[in-house]
Design a protein with these regions (language model features):
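Short coil/turn motifs that cap or connect alpha-helices
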Residues: 62, 151, 161-163
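Alpha-helical transmembrane segments within multi-pass membrane transporters and channels
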Residues: 42-82
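Transmembrane helix-bundle core of multi-pass membrane transporters
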Residues: 75-139, 164-168
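Generic alpha-helical transmembrane segments of integral inner-membrane proteins
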Residues: 8-9, 50-62, 89, 123-131
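Single transmembrane alpha-helix segments in multi-pass membrane proteins
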Residues: 1-41, 66-71
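Hydrophobic alpha-helical transmembrane segments
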Residues: 3-4, 25-29, 46-54, 76-77, ...
Length: 170
């Protein structure tokens, strides 16, 4: 389910004719942030999830800002650099040690339990896929993402803030 969730986020970048090489490192860094909190005694799974999501979103925002505000030549360059920064950051915050969530029953439940015979992680992926489908097909933001991917200049001329859409996608 990890690859399925990462590919969902990557889909937005691909639709806008870009690429984000840092998605795996971003997910790893976010998990290491949560792992650092577990090592410090935090056992609230909701807070761990919020920290991981906020951390990953912040990194994506930085990637988007590097691309749209600093006008780096191609997303390949900025996200490749960010990938290396995130790998280093993950090693620093974990002190190059393996982090285990085995003492946290709620986190273990998410990764190993089933509901009606389906793994919980699979159900989470399905929910995220449905949300992404609704976002891309039923909202103005979804149409804007497709427009920016098709022709950023035409999207800008039609009133779409291409820079904001690209920043959102990363």
């Amino acid at each position: 389910s990890f690859n399925a969730l990462v590919s969902t986020g990557m889909l937005l970048c691909l639709i806008t004719a870009g690429i984000d090489l840092s998605v795996g490192a971003n997910a790893t860094f976010a998990a290491c942030l949560a792992g650092m909190l577990v090592n410090k005694g935090m056992n609230n799974p909701v807070l761990l999830l919020v920290v991981a999501i906020v951390g990953g979103t912040l990194i994506g925002w930085i990637n988007g800002m590097l691309l749209t505000r600093l006008h780096l030549p191609h997303p390949f360059v900025s996200t490749l650099g960010m990938k290396n920064v995130l790998w280093g950051g993950a090693l620093i915050i974990t002190n190059s040690q393996m982090v285990s969530f085995s003492g946290n029953d709620a986190v273990m439940w998410l990764g190993s339990s089933t509901v009606a015979g389906f793994p919980v992680s699979f159900i989470v992926v399905l929910v995220i896929y449905v949300i992404m489908h609704i976002l891309l097909t039923k909202t103005a933001l979804g149409r804007s993402i497709y427009c920016v991917g098709g022709n950023p200049e035409a999207a800008r001329l039609s009133g779409i803030n291409s820079a904001n859409v690209l920043t959102f996608c990363y």
